[in-house]
Amino acid sequence: MPKYRSATTTHGRNMAGARALWRATGVKDEDFGKPIIAVVNSFTQFVPGHVHLKDLGQLVAQEIEAAGGIAKEFNTIAVDDGIAMGHGGMLYSLPSRELIADSVEYMVNAHCADAMVCISNCDKITPGMLMASMRLNIPVIFVSGGPMEAGKTKLSDQIIKLDLVDAMIQGADPKVSDEQSEQIERSACPTCGSCSGMFTANSMNCLTEALGLSQPGNGSLLATHADRKELFINAGKRIVELTKRYYEQDDETALPRNIATKAAFENAMALDIAMGGSTNTVLHLLAAAQEGEVDFDMTDIDRMSRQVPHLCKVAPSTQKYHMEDVHRAGGVVGILGELNRAGLLHNQSKTVLGLTWEEQLAKYDIMLTDSEEVKSFYRAGPAGIRTTQAFSQDCRWDTLDDDRAEGCIRTKENAFSQDGGLAVLKGNIALDGCIVKTAGVDESILKFTGPAVVFESQEDAVDGILGGKVKAGDVVVIRYEGPKGGPGMQEMLYPTTYLKSMGLGKECALLTDGRFSGGTSGLSIGHASPEAANGGAIGLVQDGDLIAIDIPNRSISLEISEQELAERRVKQDELGWKPANRQREVSFALKAYASMATSADKGAVRDKSKLEG
């Protein structure tokens, strides 16, 4: 039977000093011997998705202590990708994922904590905590801060739903008046919570549900809704049960690696494809799988992308539906229920509730359950009141959205498309693959061939797009923006947004070894691997080269001969794989990150082989 990790610091005469320090934190005589559970919070006033988390750690802590544990809270950093976007700050976003994972490991191992509750929400925080959880493999439950309410405003006598991306597009569109742009800006982000569409933050919080590491509603229940408080309360209670199951009953099914198995990762990826989630989730799932030694890679994602239909269409792929609408339609459980009925779910995988997915669907799927309590839970809706307070309202929709033919969530037979919402493309320009969010691509450009317009940085691309260098029919290539080449693999939301504002959203393609915001739509292909800085063929493209994209056949190719490609490679080897004439200040911290970063097909994790020998 495993021994409590915390006993290392709480038992024996030689630990008198450690016990003295524990006592100084409030631990009493009768507490020694109880499990020490880390409450890993990520409160910050910099990020709307985290601004309301300050008191929620102590809410969880109270429940842990009432259930017989010792709760100790600490915080991680949290970068707001939207605020860091479009300037040098974005270089720090992806590297912060590794920093978060490491800091959780440092705190938990330094103090010998027995288990964790991870309070996350936004883009790199959930993935960083997930990586740490799989690395440490101690009992864990995730509970996120929840999504923001969708913005709403009246334009042309019609109420429309808004989000951050709408504010960016309107702000860059010269045809939009200053007054309208300001109106959109003031309405786009009305409450605390992660941005209201199926962007990276909400995608990842949904995926923790599918992995089995969080409770029903975690990914979709609004941050402002009173019902969300129960998720935090229940997390505190449940983590003590899981902890005692493992340490006192030798039940290894309570450990994250035995919950988030390969089957669970396939469930999460199936959900991601079905809901047209952010392409960033591919990076993060691959990274988490590596941390947990789960055999899950791009080959699995490619296979699944050909099998799973697109069942749920949400902003930024449509303005009609946001996360509040996904919740009304049954949330993550609703989507997984449709995948199960289509034979596309591993329904014997287990969750932190101790149930198989088959059992959990029977209890929480609005299409199966008779429980009025569950149905009321999924009717939790927005209040439309600006606030930074969690649990501040208890509004409910009059009805659920159980229309599986034309509603927010659909059956396989009524899918938005039988082809899923994400696809892996391969070809001579991306031998190890690249990713496109097909949910956001107009059907008219699923096949696209055009001349390359090459930029060595995101900044140059923005200047080129706004300066008229890019024309209808072009393929914009932005390179040396990968994990190593950036460094930090910036998001290309501004280039894609400006293509839309210039009327080119359906007239151009964009290819990059960087990545995209979850708010991106259009023919935007990212994660080209190997990246340019690692000798990838994207570094060999020249202005005017034809690039052929064929999403239905999962291919992308540079239309030049193999001989020409080989000759260019010889020349580039001599020059070195570096961006030409790019002036960018890179700090020591970012250089250290770049020195070990792998390309996107490996999850942009650190290359452990560099530590061997």
Curated annotation (Swiss-Prot):
Keywords: 2Fe-2S, Amino-acid biosynthesis, Branched-chain amino acid biosynthesis, Iron, Iron-sulfur, Lyase, Magnesium, Metal-binding. The keyword Transmembrane does not apply. One of its GO terms (molecular function) is magnesium ion binding. It is an enzyme of class 4 (lyase). The modification N6-carboxylysine is found at K124. The keyword Transport does not apply. GO terms for cellular component: cytosol. Its EC number is 4.2.1.9. It holds the Pfam family ILV_EDD_C. [2Fe-2S] cluster binds at C122, C195. Coiled coil: none annotated. Pathway: Amino-acid biosynthesis; L-isoleucine biosynthesis; L-isoleucine from 2-oxobutanoate: step 3/4; Amino-acid biosynthesis; L-valine biosynthesis; L-valine from pyruvate: step 3/4. Binds 1 [2Fe-2S] cluster per subunit. This cluster acts as a Lewis acid cofactor. HAMAP family: IlvD. PANTHER family: D-XYLONATE DEHYDRATASE, D-XYLONATE DEHYDRATASE YAGF-RELATED. Homodimer. Belongs to the IlvD/Edd family. This is Dihydroxy-acid dehydratase. The lineage of its organism: Bacteria, Pseudomonadati, Pseudomonadota, Gammaproteobacteria, Vibrionales.
